């Protein structure tokens, strides 16, 4: 089980990333625009650096919805491998069954 503070930190990062998403996209568009002047591009870089660090989507961590486990996360289910296996064994995931050959 992950600490509550770690889960809360990820929730905070998700909210910040959502809040600054449009501003971040606009600044990155200016930075990658070849037709923009060097000064405009440099100012966009400086503005991007002033945004909160946690507003970057790459700072978010995928976590299991039930346990908060950060490793062995399966995106399709939103759970860790352990919880997916437990749910599959109980028959809670439609269409998923144990492999046998």
Curated annotation (Swiss-Prot):
PROSITE patterns: RIBOSOMAL_S14 (PS00527). One of its GO terms (biological process) is translation. Keywords: Ribonucleoprotein, Ribosomal protein, RNA-binding, rRNA-binding. The keyword Ribonucleoprotein applies. GO terms for molecular function: rRNA binding; structural constituent of ribosome. GO terms for cellular component: cytoplasm; small ribosomal subunit. The keyword Ligase does not apply. InterPro entries: Ribosomal_uS14, Ribosomal_uS14_bac/plastid, Ribosomal_uS14_CS. Part of the 30S ribosomal subunit. Contacts proteins S3 and S10. HAMAP family: Ribosomal_uS14_1 (MF_00537). NCBIfam families: PRK08881.1. Belongs to the universal ribosomal protein uS14 family. This is Small ribosomal subunit protein uS14. It comes from Photorhabdus laumondii subsp. laumondii (strain DSM 15139 / CIP 105565 / TT01).
